[in-house]
Structures are given as structure tokens and as C-alpha cells.
Amino acid sequence: MSKLLILLLLSLVASIFSTPLDDYVNAPDDTYKWTLNNTIEYETFTGYILELTSQTWMAEKSDWPVWKHWVSICVPKGVTTTTTFIYVDGGSNDNWKVPGSMDQTIEIVCLSSGSVSVGLTQIPNQPIIFNNDGVQRFEDDLVAYTWRQFLGNTSEPLWLARLPMTKAVVKCMDAVQEFGKTIGYNSENFVIAGASKRGWTTWLAGVVDPRIIAIVPIVMPILNMIPNMGHQFYAYGEWSFALNDYTGQGVMDYLNGPQMVELAAIVDPFSYRDRYTMPIYAIASSDDEFFLPDSPQFFWNNLTATPEKHLRIVPNAEHSLMGHQIDIILSIVTFVRLLITNQPRPTFTWDITYSEDLNSGTIVLTVPEGGIIPYKVKVWTAVTESTTRRDFRIITCMDITKCIQFIIWDPSDITPTSTGVYSITLSKPDAGWRAFFLEAEYLYAKNSIDDEYTLKFTSEVAIVPNTLPFGSCSEYNACGDGSQGDSASSTATL
């Protein structure tokens, strides 16, 4: 068979299995360009600031169609690896000016990992006014609005903001590679990380570009999004305040409808699970106001194409991970160092089982024979403050002065029951629900930033009793199938 015929067949197969996300990301865009706007010399690294124009999106319906980003590149002295780390971040289009310094996160990763490290900002570009409605939309308000536009007319997938957000990451990689050639550095491949909406973008970037060899999605355990989102109502009897932008746009009126299935086919990373053939280090928070601590149950075991996957639940942390940033950064640094030096990463499996009456649960963590034994293993446990809601959130409403729950996750060291096997069984509390998970910590060489490099992986979360206090959102008219219009309420009648 000729090479030309093989290429044609491969192209045909790719087109058959492509989605609107693939099509948008791969579409040529003459808007793309970059310029070097600043060079900053430091003793241990050189910083470069690029102004990147990634694309034009929704030109006829947006007041900000041309997307621009600041790209900060940290090149450590004597860099030897050709793997580049990119952290996808947010930002605002307002007060557009050249950054005068490197982002601290990028600097830490750069110096601690020894790799070229990049900060990509303005994902998404914001604020944006759509359809001349005069409303400046940021973050979830922006994303929810674009969802609602698509749900109302699924023939227009370009409305979905996740498409340009993902393409911006791809164009950032293009710019970094092109710029690297001007300074004698070759970025062959990339590790991508990002949090929240940028975490979702990290998931999707990993499936559209083969240059990405590992991803670190942070506080975005959204995969299998339809049942994952619906699970929240079973636990709370209402939608979390964190979803106000989505309920306000009437998105939940489509949760069980064919339109949401079409949306998920484009933007739900679960739809692309067979493409996750690279290492994944997924980081989530125990008290997230967007997600539940057991959200990974909806997708983790289904990532069967992934050769290496690691989960970390951060205890006593809400969605912003306030107070935990340095610990998380250093854990990511260790993961990146092990990747770029081709060293083995720790692995283990876990199994969660419940008693017949669902009132007690057991987690067994097993290190494979010959595997790396953790420095220590802890069990983290917490009990809900509410006795009617299975609710582990720290913050339960927009006004945090009125709705703080004192959910405290307590650690206890546990010893192995045999070599590399750790087991814990806990029972339900006198009232409410108890959640628990196992955390394995690994210790590596010292560095100039911290005493040691630490790497933390965890099991999923078990909750006892293994029961949910409410029915589905549809039972309470809090979601719909897309046929009744924007009419659903947001709260169960208690």
C-alpha cells in the first residue's frame, strides 16, 4: 500500500471520529501571531514575555472576538530537558499591559523542576459582551451563557466557550515552539496543568494534541458530567450556590435532555476517554462547592486507556485551594521531575467496599509487588455538620459570613497490614455522614524551595452510611429534559 493511500486513509478515519472540538482547534486562523514584548534577566533564569493572539471567535456576536494572552516563559540556566511545562491560568482583558515580572508559580516550577515553564493567561478572554446585551460576562457566567446558546440551538457548536479556551492552549504550544527556535531551545513535548475552568481546558487539551505527554487537571472532577452533576442534587436536595450562573441561565432545564447529551459529546472529557493515553495527575479538593468529594466515582475506573493515572484529594480545601497552593505546586514539581527524568512514579490500587447494611465501609490500598512503598500513609476523615444533607462543603452560600460549615478532616497514620497493603474500616457517625480516604506520601531529594520534594496520591473517598438523602432533581422539578423551557426550580421541598 502506498504512503499516499495510507495518509488518505488515516485522514479519513480522523475526519470520521472528529468532533466540533477537533474541527475548531484544527481550523486555520490567520489571526494567530505572537510578539516578544519583554525580556527579564535573573541570576538563575531568563524570563520572556510574549503577547499571543490565538484566534478570532464569534466575531459577529462578541464585543471581544480576537483573543489575546500574555505568555510568560521561564528558561532556567543550563536547561537540558526538551519537555516544557505550561500552567493555564485566568485573567482579565482590562488594563492590558506587559507584565513586568514572572508569575511566582511559574518561577517555582521552573527552578525546582529544571524545565522550561510557561504561564498562559486570559483563559478565557474576559469580560465579553454577547449579542449586544450590555452584560459583561466573566468566568462561569460566560461559560453558562454559551452553554445556554448551544442548548437552544445545537446546530451551533461554535458557541461553546470551551472550544476557544482549548485552542488557545494549542496555539500557546505553537508559539512556545516557534519562539524557542529563536533562542536555541527545542520544546518537543508538554505537560499541561490548570485549575477550575482551566482544569477542564487541561482535560480537553490532552485529547486534541499529541505533543501533550501528561496532564494535571486541578479541581475539575467533572467527567461523565450529566450523572456527575445530577449526583449533587441527591446529596443536597438543591443545586449548590456555585452553580448559580448555570441555574440562572436555565441550563439545568436541559440536564436530562438530548441537547445536554450533544453538549457532553463535545465538551465532556469523558466522551474522549479512549484518547487519554498519557499520564494523568488529577487533583481535587475535599470540600469543593462545585463538586462532591466522591465525584471521581463517575469516571475514574473508566479511564481504561490511560497507562498511568494518579488521584489526589486535598483535605480541608474548598474550590480555590486556599492555603494549599505551595504544597500542591511542589507535588506537581515532583511529578514533572519524575516525568522528565524518566524515573518511575509510585503506583497503587485501591478497593472500596461497604457492609451489607451500608453503615460501614472499607478502603484497601495495595502497592504492587516491587512498587515504591510510601513514606507514610494516612487516613483522612470528616463528618458532615448537617444531619439532613450529605454535605461536606465549607462554604454553602454566596455570603460566606452567613454559611460557613466547620467541616474538619482529621488525619491519622496507619500501618500496613502486610507489605504494601493498607486497610481501614470505619462506621457511620451517630448522625450525618462520615467520609474518609487514604493518602500516600512519598519523599524525594531536598531542594532550594522546600526541605523535601513530596508527592501525594490518594484513593477515592468512601462515605458512610452509603446512602443519599434525596431523590433525583427531576423528582423535585429542579431539572428537565429540554422540552418544557426554562421552568425548573432549584430546591427540593424538605
Curated annotation (Swiss-Prot):
Q: Where in the cell is it found?
A: Secreted
Q: What inducers act on this gene?
A: Up-regulated by phagocytic stimuli.
**UniProt KW Transit peptide keyword:** no
Q: What happens when the gene is disrupted?
A: Cells proliferate more rapidly than wild type cells and exhibit supernumerary centrosomes and a cytokinesis defect. They also produce fewer spores at culmination.
Q: Does the keyword Glycoprotein apply?
A: yes
- Where does the UniProt annotation place the signal sequence? 1-18
Q: Which Gene3D superfamilies match?
A: alpha/beta hydrolase
Keywords from UniProt, A to Z, are:
Cell cycle, Glycoprotein, Secreted, Signal
Q: Which GO terms describe its biological process?
A: negative chemotaxis; negative regulation of aggregate size involved in sorocarp development; negative regulation of asexual reproduction; negative regulation of Ras protein signal transduction; protein localization to plasma membrane; sporulation resulting in formation of a cellular spore
Q: Which residues form a coiled coil?
A: none
Provide a GO CC annotation, any one: extracellular region
Q: Name one GO molecular function term.
A: signaling receptor binding
Identify the glycosylated residues: 37, 153, 302
Q: Which InterPro entries match?
A: AB_hydrolase_fold, PhoPQ-act_pathogen-rel_PqaA
Q: What's this chain's function?
A: Inhibitor that slows proliferation of secreting cells (also known as chalone). May function by binding to cell surface receptors. Requires cfaD for activity. Overexpression slows proliferation.
What does the subunit section of this Swiss-Prot or TrEMBL entry state?
A: Interacts with cfaD.
- Give the protein family: Belongs to the pqaA family.
Quote the protein name from its UniProt record.
Autocrine proliferation repressor protein A
